């Protein structure tokens, strides 16, 4: 569960490391927390420094500190979300993947966490591109 001002880990290679949630975009109550598969608006709190290529241009998909981005929650530390078959899954941390605001495509090209796993509910909600980038779908 992600509330406003929650700091979460970014697990793609877009350059961001930590993001702070500033708005939950979902149907229902505006004060309800974000669950796995929900879209959030976040501010990048910590990012890797931009490096220049040999040609002298920076990567276009990179984000920097202070940027406002959209993201999809892919893992949650809370265990209170029950699936249709009655099982529950809890991960060790809460993580998200940055996406394009208009198209919904991921900004990064890889999911780079220690294990690279995401929740299965993303596939049910139509985020097949994120599931294909992940090494495991649990």
Curated annotation (Swiss-Prot):
Main location per the UniProt record: mitochondrion
Keywords of this entry: Mitochondrion, Ribonucleoprotein, Ribosomal protein
Record-level Gene Ontology MF annotations: large ribosomal subunit rRNA binding; structural constituent of ribosome
GO biological process, one term: mitochondrial translation
Presence of keyword Ribosomal protein: yes
GO cellular component terms listed in the entry, alphabetical order: mitochondrial inner membrane; mitochondrial large ribosomal subunit; mitochondrion
Compartment(s): Mitochondrion
Keyword Ribosomal protein listed: yes
Pfam family, one: Ribosomal_L14
InterPro entries per record: Ribosomal_uL14, Ribosomal_uL14_bac-type, Ribosomal_uL14_CS, Ribosomal_uL14_sf
Cited SUPFAM superfamilies: Ribosomal protein L14
Intrachain disulfide bonds: none
Signal peptide: none
Comment field (misc): Present with 2500 molecules/cell in log phase SD medium.
Free-text function comment from the UniProt entry: Component of the mitochondrial ribosome (mitoribosome), a dedicated translation machinery responsible for the synthesis of mitochondrial genome-encoded proteins, including at least some of the essential transmembrane subunits of the mitochondrial respiratory chain. The mitoribosomes are attached to the mitochondrial inner membrane and translation products are cotranslationally integrated into the membrane.
Assembly and interaction partners: Component of the mitochondrial large ribosomal subunit (mt-LSU). Mature yeast 74S mitochondrial ribosomes consist of a small (37S) and a large (54S) subunit. The 37S small subunit contains a 15S ribosomal RNA (15S mt-rRNA) and 34 different proteins. The 54S large subunit contains a 21S rRNA (21S mt-rRNA) and 46 different proteins.
Family to which this protein belongs: Belongs to the universal ribosomal protein uL14 family.
Protein name, UniProt field: Large ribosomal subunit protein uL14m
Organism name: Saccharomyces cerevisiae (strain ATCC 204508 / S288c) (Baker's yeast)
């Amino acid at each position: 569960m992600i509330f406003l001002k929650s700091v979460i880990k970014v697990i793609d290679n877009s350059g961001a490391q930590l993001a702070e949630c500033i708005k939950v975009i979902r149907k229902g109550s505006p004060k309800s927390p974000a669950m796995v598969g929900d879209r959030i608006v976040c501010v990048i709190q910590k990012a890797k420094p931009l490096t220049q290529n040999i040609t002298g241009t920076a990567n276009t998909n990179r984000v920097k500190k202070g940027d406002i981005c959209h993201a999809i929650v892919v893992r949650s530390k809370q265990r209170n979300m029950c699936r249709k078959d009655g099982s529950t899954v809890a991960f060790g941390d809460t993580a998200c993947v940055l996406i394009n605001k208009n198209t919904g495509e991921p900004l990064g090209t890889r999911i780079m966490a220690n294990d690279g796993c995401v929740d299965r509910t993303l596939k049910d909600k139509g985020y097949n591109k994120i599931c294909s980038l992940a090494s495991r779908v649990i």
